Amino acid sequence: MSFICWGVFQENRLKPRCRQPRAKQNCFVRQLVKFLGLLLAFCWLSQSVKAETLLLKSSKGVPFRLNKVADGLGVPWGMAFIGPEQILLTERNGKIGILDTVSGVITRITGGPKVMHSGQGGLLDVAVPPGYSQRGWIYFSYSKAQQGKGVTTLARAKLKGKRLVTLQDMLITRSASTTGRHFGSRITFDGTGHLFFSVGDRGVRPNGQDLSTHAGSILRLTLDGSVPENNPFVQQKNALPEIWSYGHRNPQGMFYDKKHQRLWSIEHGPRGGDEINLILRGRNYGWPVISYGKEYWGPVQVGEGTEKEGMEKPIKFYVPSIAPGSLIVYSGKAFPAWKGNLFAGALKLTHLNRVEIDNSGKAVAEDRLLEGLGERIRALVESPQGWLYFSTDSGKIFRLRPLVNNP
């Protein structure tokens, strides 16, 4: 930056224009003040632009612009658009706000749930279903204290002015644990009156294969919290009826692709073995029996191997782990070349992960965007314009949009 400003100074050196000594002195002072003002403005503008905007290019040749929209937040865990330029966001410390994406101003919202903010727990996801503008319900996931243990909980409320009202817990899951780990959890909607809700194994590995606990499962409910009659384990003894799939470790990303009617999830493996899974009704996704990860304490494979009859293999796995914190299927018009791609935020390897999927649902290519940003990318959401917004654990919100807007 100093090099740029010095270059401007050299190109715009003052030239004496006054002949009389006093007039010359006054003239020089006026010109100096004017020049320094211009120089200061130029340098400030240069610093501002460089701090707020980065120009990058993906490996597929899609140019885009990255802007920082907001800063100074707690860990922004969930984001949902409730208007063309308004993002409702949750912070893990329990705070809720509405971000104006044009001005960057955040309006604080009161009336949220009382959260157990400990370890990986706190106020987690926020999501709004199709038809939000008519019904007004907003859905949250959070960790709730229950007899000294943390429990992943699904709740909903309505927004009235700057306050949440009619707050109600829809499902306090059977997932109590004293560990502060693996709460999940993401919320997504299929557009036909159902929601899906992920719950981590709570750091207790056997939970993944235990149908008598919600931990280590993806759940399916109606929008009022009741259990659909066609859930796979409704009639099975000792199985919880909310369970849609099981054998999961810690799914922190989940998205329902309405165009292809596919439910996708991404979950943390142990040391290696993060997975992208296509979630099907009643299927077992293997944790902790099968995994591509290794034990934390040594170079020993977790479980019995990477495949077993009756258990689903991931469509993609990551070794080493990227630590995925979110997942969406891109459907906008702003980036036509990315339509149908999966995007995930990487926490450990600090990038935006893009995966191309073919018509059969197989992963055919991967791209790692924004590796140079050095930020743990947490939540990810697509705007009505087709731009991507993401949050970071350092408390920032970024916007990624085309370098040249498409019609």
Give the residues covered by each predicted segment.
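Bacterial N-terminal signal peptides that target proteins for export
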Residues: 23-36
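Bacterial N-terminal signal peptides
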Residues: 36-44
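Conserved blade-ending motifs and adjacent loop-strand segments that build the rim/top face
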Residues: 364-382
